[in-house]
From Swiss-Prot:
SMART domains: 6PGD
Protein family (similarity comment): Belongs to the 6-phosphogluconate dehydrogenase family.
The protein's name in its UniProt record: 6-phosphogluconate dehydrogenase, decarboxylating
An example molecular function term from Gene Ontology annotations: phosphogluconate dehydrogenase (decarboxylating) activity
NCBIfam families: gnd, PRK09287.1
Pathway per the UniProt entry: Carbohydrate degradation; pentose phosphate pathway; D-ribulose 5-phosphate from D-glucose 6-phosphate (oxidative stage): step 3/3
GO biological processes: D-gluconate metabolic process; organic acid catabolic process; pentose-phosphate shunt
Keywords: Gluconate utilization, NADP, Oxidoreductase, Pentose shunt
InterPro entries recorded: 6-PGluconate_DH-like_C_sf (IPR008927), 6PGD_dom2 (IPR013328), 6PGDH_C (IPR006114), 6PGDH_Gnd/GntZ (IPR006113), 6PGDH_NADP-bd (IPR006115), 6PGdom_BS (IPR006184), NAD(P)-bd_dom_sf (IPR036291), Pgluconate_DH (IPR006183)
Reactions catalysed: 6-phospho-D-gluconate + NADP(+) = D-ribulose 5-phosphate + CO2 + NADPH
Length: 468
């Protein structure tokens, strides 16, 4: 008897996705390069419709045609090697789905290569971590739409469900569109986390709040417009005590790790010429956190103000909340502008409002305000920037003074706020009809004869700036 779908790669994500698929009534073949993981899967899957295989030949032959194969192997060379090993065993029309943490450019390359062999290829972003993989992730599949339609029922079944019952999956676009959108999702995630961390720093360093009060603050915030998974878990984190009944989070080494997708997002923004300042500052913040020894030494050598606050703490805490929400809006405005530009350049025809909808559940950045983004693009599909939508425009107009005060107070007290600072600088730059770039153009023309345009007349000009 043949199985309906196969999964290659039985690390935690692959294993949990296989179980998720099986739980929705599908029969699943599984294969792993090391047989030990396959044996463990068998042991853990008793009573489930999971079919183990111990060679690629056995695996491929166990699947009904056209074969549907989900690859959950390490991104990069391992994925290429697995595809190369599979190709001689596959038939025209079979479908490969790469669900790994893959660079979208690799997906574009593989899509082109496999098109020559009549093998359908889907590059699919998977968000939600190991729990989401098991209970329902947010899925971002890109590739041939015809191939997507053949696996849509399975993906629809296993995806997270929003409160209105909609599945958090949609066809994203051709070739690398799915993995691209997942990359930007991860970049936005970096910014969300950094902005929350800066809010915590203000509460701790400036307001002197206890971990119990910080936990309650995040729980309160989660009941309002900031409602989101990351705000929710932040409240939980501050309630967790260690073996000495002290806040565990305060014992964790302050060096933030990363897998590189935030960096990919920033590099791509540079290539596109898109100002992605908040996400990029969040990447840099992780970099500077990683040089712990240097920072400890510098703290003994470099002077600065000692944090102190003698104002109304309740009032300032509300300003932090407003600063966080406005900065979050600015970050998403940048991320969606980046996806808009990439869609134009690659002819992906991304439906930006739909992307917000599939992020409502299952993924790390799930949040109440994503519905507002969907509404913005429904009202104006050609919207250039989220800040120009009436809802978001009203919020940032009302909240900007709070953000300015938080940033200024942080600077005056030596509390670093790279994300908040970048947000207000982006806002002010974006709303500026005139920027001092005219001087930069004059400098470029002075030393390099790069020429310039003028406001008052047509044409391209070069000036001899000093008399010989």
């Amino acid at each position: 008897m043949t199985q309906q779908i196969g999964v290659i790669g039985l690390a935690v994500m692959g294993k949990n996705l296989a179980w998720n698929i099986e739980s929705h009534g599908y029969s699943v073949s599984v294969f792993n390069r090391s047989s030990e993981k396959t044996d463990l899967m068998v042991e853990e899957s008793k009573g489930k419709n999971i079919h183990p295989t111990y060679s690629l030949e056995e695996f491929v032959n166990s699947l009904e045609k056209p074969r549907k194969i989900l690859l959950m192997v390490q991104a990069g060379k391992a994925t290429d090697a697995t595809i190369d090993s599979l190709l001689p065993l596959l038939d025209d029309g079979d479908i490969l789905i790469d669900g790994g943490n893959t660079n979208y450019q690799d997906t574009i390359r593989r899509n082109k290569a496999l098109a020559q062999s009549a093998i359908n290829f889907i590059g699919m972003g998977v968000s939600g971590g190991e729990i989401g993989a098991l209970t329902g992730p947010s899925l971002m599949p890109g590739g041939q739409e015809e191939a997507y339609n053949k696996v849509a029922d399975i993906l629809d079944a296993i995806a997270a469900k929003a409160k209105d019952g909609a599945s958090c999956v949609t066809y994203i676009g051709p070739n690398g569109a799915g993995h691209y959108v997942k990359m930007v999702h991860n970049g936005i995630e970096y910014a969300d986390m950094q902005l929350i961390a800066e809010s915590y720093a203000m509460m701790k360093e400036l307001l002197g709040m206890s971990h119990e009060d910080i936990a309650q603050t995040f729980k309160d915030w989660n009941a309002g417009e900031l409602e989101s998974y990351l705000i929710e878990i932040t409240g939980d984190i501050f309630m967790k005590l260690d073996e000495n009944k002290e806040a565990l989070v305060e014992k964790i080494l302050d060096t933030a790790g990363q897998k590189g997708t935030g960096k990919w997002t920033s590099i791509n923004a540079l290539e596109l010429g898109i100002p992605l300042t908040i996400i990029t500052e969040s990447v840099f913040a992780r970099f500077i956190s990683s040089i712990k020894e240097e920072r400890v030494n510098a703290s003994k050598e470099l002077n600065g103000p000692k944090a102190s606050f003698d104002g109304d703490k309740k009032d300032f805490l509300e300003k932090i909340r407003k600063a966080l929400y406005m900065s979050k809006i600015c970050s998403y405005a940048q991320g969606f502008a980046q996806m808009r530009k990439a869609s134009e350049d690659n002819e992906w025809n991304l439906k930006l409002g739909d992307l917000a909808m599939i992020w409502r559940e299952g993924c790390i950045i799930r949040a109440q305000f994503l519905q507002k983004i969907k509404d913005a693009y429904d009202n104006n599909p050609g919207l250039q920037n989220l800040l120009l939508d009436p809802y978001f425009k009203n919020i940032v107009t009302e909240y900007q003074d709070a953000l300015r005060d938080v940033v200024a107070t942080g600077v005056q007290n030596g509390v670093p706020t790279p994300g908040f600072s970048s947000s207000i600088n982006y806002y002010d730059s974006y709303r500026a009809a005139d920027l001092p770039a005219n001087l930069i153009q004059a400098q470029r023309d002075y030393f390099g004869a790069h020429t310039y345009e003028r406001k008052d007349k047509e044409g391209v000009f070069h000036t001899q700036w000093i008399e010989e």
